[in-house]
Amino acid sequence: MFFKGYVETNGKKCIEKFKNRNDFKTYEQVERLNSFAGILSKETVLVDIDDYEESEILFKIIKEKGLKCRVYKTTRGKHFLFKNNGLDKCRTHCFLAIGINADIKIGKVNSYSVLKVDGVEREIIYDNAENEEADLLPKYLTPVRSNMEFLNMEAGDG
């Protein structure tokens, strides 16, 4: 299960308290709202790629490998939802082992994913996670300590 419930937002900003709480709204209760978010379940990890080109590279890999996950189209890139493989904190502007820059959100620290903004629901463009049972986040999508821009390297660099 990707989300443990839903909360109302104002655009992308959450307007309901969601920490230390279990009485979240259902999808049916929020679907008519102008903006809402899903509270990530404990076992969910969200990989947020804001660069369109980089998000397309990862999307192609996921489709070719047939990975079980869910992918949302965003205004700038894509959100990829997987089962957490042991990450214990959220990260911003980190490099993944595959060389792509991403933000990472994890459910066990009360994170949310905006699903509808100003009346427009984010489109699910890929979802082959049966009953929302996704694959573990692949090792090549875990954060690494590096500031090298692998995608911009040429032969002989590094």
Mark where each language-model region is.
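DNA replication initiation modules
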Residues: 38-53, 59, 83-158
